[in-house]
Amino acid sequence: MDNLITRHQRILVVFPHPDDESFTAAGLLAMAIEGGSHVTYACLTLGEMGRNMGFPPFANRVNLPTIRKKELEESAEAIGIQDLRMLGFHDKMIEFENPDLLDKVIGNLLEELRPTLIFTFYPGYSVHPDHDATGAAVIRAVEKLPADERPLVYCSAFSSGHEQAIGKADIIIDASSFLPQKMASIQAHRTQFQAAELVGNQELNSKEIKRRFGTESFWTYRFE
């Protein structure tokens, strides 16, 4: 882990929705930032088509984009992210976007930021079509770079049976020391985090929180 912090001072995170950063990489990002890394988070959409409106509901279809934008800003602040970019794509439409446009947008970020490490979703193994399409766009953009100029790409994967296809994660991080930042990031997404498929509305004790959220796992993408 020390090697990650010292080697990767410019990190780019590319996810499609607010809260993807929270559950996937908030602890590791907080750790890297504390170690001196500069993190740019490019969030493709505002998750405006999400079905969760809070528990009990306090948002609606009209104001959800504004609320989720604010939640995203609060989440990034909780992690310590220095540079938050909202790219303005439409939620649940990433798979239908012009691939050339996605590649150009991400390629421009690569050219501007020169990251040495990128976090995204593993295309084909991250359940949601927006996740898969986002990860695929990142891989295409990085693949266009000369091999010796490509940043490392750490991917999150969690589809059913993914380990049979891509093996076990090769990057496993104990982020338990950064659970306060991670949980603050999760809880910033007030419209979302109590959904049954996420945290749920039950109270979690410290042992349960550490078990569920204290470890973050990634797959290094292997370019051919």
Language model regions located:
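Active-site rim/loop-helix segments in enzyme catalytic domains that contact anionic ligands
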Residues: 1-113, 144-147
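Metal-dependent de-N-acetylase/amidase catalytic core
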Residues: 1-12, 83, 92, 96-224
